[in-house]
Amino acid sequence: MIERGKFRSLTLINWNGFFARTFDLDELVTTLSGGNGAGKSTTMAAFVTALIPDLTLLHFRNTTEAGATSGSRDKGLHGKLKAGVCYSMLDTINSRHQRVVVGVRLQQVAGRDRKVDIKPFAIQGLPMSVQPTQLVTETLNERQARVLPLNELKDKLEAMEGVQFKQFNSITDYHSLMFDLGIIARRLRSASDRSKFYRLIEASLYGGISSAITRSLRDYLLPENSGVRKAFQDMEAALRENRMTLEAIRVTQSDRDLFKHLISEATNYVAADYMRHANERRVHLDKALEFRRELHTSRQQLAAEQYKHVDMARELAEHNGAEGDLEADYQAASDHLNLVQTAQRQQEKIERYEADLDELQIRLEEQNEVVAEAIERQEENEARAEAAELEVDELKSQLADYQQALDVQQTRAIQYNQAIAALNRAKELCHLPDLTADSAAEWLETFQAKEQEATEKMLSLEQKMSMAQTAHSQFEQAYQLVVAINGPLARNEAWDVARELLREGVDQRHLAEQVQPLRMRLSELEQRLREQQEAERLLADFCKRQGKNFDIDELEALHQELEARIASLSDSVSNAREERMALRQEQEQLQSRIQSLMQRAPVWLAAQNSLNQLSEQCGEEFTSSQDVTEYLQQLLEREREAIVERDEVGARKNAVDEEIERLSQPGGSEDQRLNALAERFGGVLLSEIYDDVSLEDAPYFSALYGPSRHAIVVPDLSQVTEHLEGLTDCPEDLYLIEGDPQSFDDSVFSVDELEKAVVVKIADRQWRYSRFPEVPLFGRAARESRIESLHAEREVLSERFATLSFDVQKTQRLHQAFSRFIGSHLAVAFESDPEAEIRQLNSRRVELERALSNHENDNQQQRIQFEQAKEGVTALNRILPRLNLLADDSLADRVDEIRERLDEAQEAARFVQQFGNQLAKLEPIVSVLQSDPEQFEQLKEDYAYSQQMQRDARQQAFALTEVVQRRAHFSYSDSAEMLSGNSDLNEKLRERLEQAEAERTRAREALRGHAAQLSQYNQVLASLKSSYDTKKELLNDLQRELQDIGVRADSGAEERARIRRDELHAQLSNNRSRRNQLEKALTFCEAEMDNLTRKLRKLERDYFEMREQVVTAKAGWCAVMRMVKDNVVERRLHRRELAYLSADDLRSMSDKALGALRLAVADNEHLRDVLRMSEDPKRPERKIQFFVAVYQHLRERIRQDIIRTDDPVEAIEQMEIELSRLTEELTSREQKLAISSRSVANIIRKTIQREQNRIRMLNQGLQNVSFGQVNSVRLNVNVRETHAMLLDVLSEQHEQHQDLFNSNRLTFSEALAKLYQRLNPQIDMGQRTPQTIGEELLDYRNYLEMEVEVNRGSDGWLRAESGALSTGEAIGTGMSILVMVVQSWEDESRRLRGKDISPCRLLFLDEAARLDARSIATLFELCERLQMQLIIAAPENISPEKGTTYKLVRKVFQNTEHVHVVGLRGFAPQLPETLPGSDEAPSQES
């Protein structure tokens, strides 16, 4: 059995109180006993410092304030040291019986911070006889010694044979050596690990349950599952690398697209310019020849235009002279027309106003009568209203007087007075002083008869007045008519003048009736006169155009001659037109055919390019479409064979991948069901137990266990029996072996080993012979070896698969190219060359153009002659119908005679028109002018007097009536009769008053209504008089204006004036039109001459420039062609299909490509500079240089190990194939790399279950531990609820969250974190990233919660907390937990360290007096059972029965402080033996 390593001694050099002291450590318990300040804590601090020399962790709490200021950082260490070099060394012996001394050199650093410098070192190979103090001290004399510095110590040890001295610059290296040699239980890789180790030592040193440890028990007790984490990290790294590779492929594909784009645009840019220059060179040659032809033609045209200009200038001068006369005539005719139109408008107004005046005269007379009647009625109404008013006033006065008398009993007196007043008023009005009440009735009858007589007389006068007024109105009307016609005259002359006017009217009316026939006759003669003048003008113009004068008799013969000439020229022109049409038709047919061929040529050229590419790719020549289809069949067969071979290689590669995946399973399980069964049975796979077997031993153990190499090792087979019932989900043969998985050996079988084979005696009658497998798979090393060979095979298969995939894709692309060719170009690829036919047709077209030009020149002369003859015939056709007018000489005299007669008739018509209505009105009433009614005014005065007399008689009668009515008031008999009479009179008065008021109201209403009506009649009358006067005045003004105009406004005058004006306007327009035509033609001719002159100069200049340009371009083109041929790029640039595009299209194509290229080469300085230089249009060879630079740039970027070609175009095609294959392969690899969520859950669950089992095993070691009331200690491990739900979802409901795990944007860790957040939205994740959270969730320790429980007294199991336990119980419980932690660390580190080493176990306990004797005995028992060393510090009253005890006493001797140490080893029957080195230390050298 492997012995456990032990700490032999602790050596302190130059510490406070210890100059050179070595403490031999007991194998179990070492007790440091002494009072306060004896040096117990200093000793333990020295041990801890040598064990963990990390100043960031060291913190000795009981002396922190004593040895350092507030700014100190030594945490209590500075005050424990003396000045100078100090050492703390541990002498150990490990399981291999190797002596190892490890320690630190400490030295105070001067300064206010009181820092301490620490240097760790290790010594190996030191003989057992050499003590640690002998190494670091040098004896000067019997009483003095010197501490050696570290460099002298190094030199001293190097001088000793076999001794190795190592000085460490980092604490990690120091601890790494200590771990490898078995001094510490755990490899401390980082500051975090060192902190955990220090917290453990600190917790044991000061005792109790450390909160720092209990809070992080998972980190102390649960080992980090680095394999699982590494597997996940490797998987994510592989996935990340795979995705990065895929992204790189996408980038490469974009680079490929960029290359493709660069080649395409560079080709378009340069080829378009190249073909444009080629086209322009040919065009320039054609233009030079064309310029020469145009130069000759233009000179001829200029001479013809000069002759034409002279003729038109002469004709223009003639028309300019005639235009002035025509303008004067036209202006006079326009003015005359305006006067006629004005006179007609005036005449129409006069007629309209005369009609209005007649109507107003009638209405005015009617209105006068209406107003007179209204005045009479108004006067009557006024009299009636006045009488009614007087009667009402009288009645009101009587009634008021009567009421007043009645009130004061004087009614009769009042009535009497009223009667007397009425009598007096009647006397006054009637002029009757003797009138009495009795005679009133008689006088009333007299005055009523007088009133009746006055009324009859007034009516008689009114009738006479009406008749006189009518006669007076007729005389005035007739007199006004005579005045209107003849002017002012005396009233007595009206009768004679009126008769003379009526006779003159009859004569004027007869003359007016002849106006229309005379006007028609004049119009006819004037029209003939104008036609005669037009004929004379046409004849003069014709003679001028013909260049000679012709008589009237010669015109008909000349007309026949010209018609004969037209017929002959027409035949010639017609024949020439047919011939020209035939030539043009042939030319159009040729042009159409050429256009058709030019449209077909690019398609044919594209088909030829595609056919040539196919021929180059496959190395075959195709002469017909049948050759193409036959080769396509061969290609399909070849593709089919390559696909079959690729699939076979792919299947083998997949098989290898599956085997690699199967062998890569943790624990060596090839069947996942075995892992589940092992967990279910609480066992371990046999392959997992033998996972560490070496490669050399793998064949032996594989043969030893044979088919049972995949067995499950269980602690007790009897407990598995119940699980086997109904078990179906398992392999066909399931092997179960009973044994302890922690200490399993191969003693299960009886084995005889043969050469390369074993014989296993399973039972007495059953043996099994198994040979060593050639490829063992038992153990991790064997599997890794097999995996390595499989990886090598996979690499070969992958390379072969890649090659075959490349060939298949290349064949498929070739097949696609053939398919595209067949679909797009096969119909035209093998047709005849259209360009050859185009050249033949172009030569024929040139011949036709030459023939057409000659024919046009010949036909031009005939056309000119034909136009001249046709123009002459047209002029004669207008002259010949007017020959009789040309011979009529008296036509002008007849026109003058008729015009004079028409003037007289129009004057009579104007008189009739002006005074015809007045004469018609005057004729029926002319007789009234014989006598003038002068008595009309006297009659009006008599009528007014009669009205006044009638009004006076009516008032007198009314006054007498009132007296008669009051006759009863003149006599009253007595008072009673008076009262009775008064009552009746009152009623009568009231009735009369009501009747009188009603009558007055009616009279007022009638008066008011009639007054309003009279006012309206007067207004209408005034309006009519005003309108009549206004219109009369306007009529007089219009008649005067018409006389002032001096033009006859008959019905035909306007038409004649308009016809005359239009004729002159037509002549003027024709003259102007011809003049404008001549001016325009002359201007055009001059412009044409100027243009021809400029054109001649320009043609001469262009011709010479074009010649020079052709010569210059030839040299540049030769340089371009030489560069193209030298760099072998003519095939790329000379794209014949571009020859059929226009220069603008090619320039646009080049400019678009240039814009794209600027963006494409923006990041490439060389290409950007070359492109910028190539933009010079005068240096086309620079574009070729740019194209060559692009090809060179792409050739340099072709990976020759993958793509074996120099042509970038072919390289891009091969790159596309290779990238497509890589994309497919990496995508499949990513699918294989990705681990499923269920697998993750199973791995974490299995790890949790394994660790729970391990904690249970650790708990078994603590079952018998007791301290005070604590009977037992245990650890509880539970899975957190939130994390358990996460595991359930991962294993059972993972399909609901595939959106996370199938996302390419999320790693598995990030997807896991997102799922955790989705399941637990209430938990705040803080500032942590999903990647960090996911990595934590992949650590199984974060799924567990751990807590310490104690079984204390009657409380049972409860959570271990400092407040619930006594001090001793807390110390004992904490020590038990620390022991468990140390044991857990050893188990965790067993695979990392050599198997022949068992590490040292040592813990501390300061102030152990807090434990009772039973608890201390328990600690001793625990140390013995666990082979653990323990250092205890206690007061003097502690006397352990076992172990080694040191008694420490601090003394001061001669101002020097030192610690006196006495050591005792246990209690025995003999006297205690003094341990070596227990004497007092020598004094320190000053």
From Swiss-Prot:
GO terms for biological process: cell division; chromosome condensation; chromosome segregation; DNA replication. SUPFAM superfamilies: P-loop containing nucleoside triphosphate hydrolases. The hinge domain, which separates the large intramolecular coiled coil regions, allows the homodimerization, forming a V-shaped homodimer. It is found in: Cytoplasm, Nucleoid. Residues 334-418, 444-480, 509-603, 835-923, 977-1115, 1209-1266 form a coiled coil. PANTHER family: CHROMOSOME PARTITION PROTEIN MUKB, DUF4476 DOMAIN-CONTAINING PROTEIN. This is Chromosome partition protein MukB. One of its GO terms (cellular component) is nucleoid. Plays a central role in chromosome condensation, segregation and cell cycle progression. Functions as a homodimer, which is essential for chromosome partition. Involved in negative DNA supercoiling in vivo, and by this means organize and compact chromosomes. May achieve or facilitate chromosome segregation by condensation DNA from both sides of a centrally located replisome during cell division. Belongs to the SMC family. MukB subfamily. It holds the Pfam family MukB_hinge. Residues 666-783 are annotated as: Flexible hinge. NCBIfam families: PRK04863.1. Homodimerization via its hinge domain. Binds to DNA via its C-terminal region. Interacts, and probably forms a ternary complex, with MukE and MukF via its C-terminal region. The complex formation is stimulated by calcium or magnesium. Interacts with tubulin-related protein FtsZ. Keywords: ATP-binding, Cell cycle, Cell division, Chromosome partition, Coiled coil, Cytoplasm, DNA condensation, DNA-binding, Nucleotide-binding.
